[in-house]
């Protein structure tokens, strides 16, 4: 996995940095593991905009990725290909299990075509293998972690991220999240060893607005150039906001805590990400 830089032959290429896709071994997805994906353009089931500045973009097929690795316990699988997935920042790996079933998983760093992976309590500690946290040594780097046993992987699934297993106490393991938060997770929860691949994603630069439009992202209009009816920053003579920066719905934009009150899971947070 590397990055491509371009000579400034056009304004759009001057600062463009994109992946070279050298790790991709297959361009067409496995037909049995894709389903149609309908565009929402940022609208919910009422047709109202819930995410602004979304719409258009290239057609996509959704790749069904296996986040429930415990379903194939103790069945070895061979990596058939590493593929691009337009629906996420990470790459995906196509596995062919010994029983003939095919599944996609997130491709961790160091996983190559021809490698064998396994899930289960007895699996070896190597990238791509999935085990319960109770069977993983302290200090190991892991990703695709479940919040609840048999709940499916929810934590650390983006390109280049991982958690570190810091300790085990009773029925809980202490994990250091990518954000720096220390959190307790039940030791029966499954996690996959290694760091999610495509680590250079954070260094990519689109270079031009059109590349963002291909992804379905529309121009992000500033509130200060809107009318008063559309945004608290709108209107007025000149460009002054007139008051504290805030969202279109009046929520302060700087230094305001937006996490809603107490919740049952608070007891599992040992240290917040901001200390």
From Swiss-Prot:
Keywords: Ribonucleoprotein, Ribosomal protein, RNA-binding, rRNA-binding. InterPro entries: NA-bd_OB-fold, Rib_uL2_dom2, Ribosomal_uL2, Ribosomal_uL2_bac/org-type, Ribosomal_uL2_C, Ribosomal_uL2_CS, Ribosomal_uL2_dom3, Ribosomal_uL2_RNA-bd_dom. One of the primary rRNA binding proteins. Required for association of the 30S and 50S subunits to form the 70S ribosome, for tRNA binding and peptide bond formation. It has been suggested to have peptidyltransferase activity; this is somewhat controversial. Makes several contacts with the 16S rRNA in the 70S ribosome. GO terms for molecular function: rRNA binding; structural constituent of ribosome; transferase activity. Part of the 50S ribosomal subunit. Forms a bridge to the 30S subunit in the 70S ribosome. It holds the Pfam family Ribosomal_L2. Residues 230-240 have a biased composition (Basic and acidic residues). The lineage of its organism: Bacteria, Thermotogati, Thermotogota, Thermotogae, Thermotogales. The keyword Ribosomal protein applies. It comes from the Bacteria. GO terms for biological process: cytoplasmic translation. Residues 223-275 are annotated as: Disordered. GO terms for cellular component: large ribosomal subunit. This is Large ribosomal subunit protein uL2. The keyword Nucleotide-binding does not apply. Belongs to the universal ribosomal protein uL2 family.
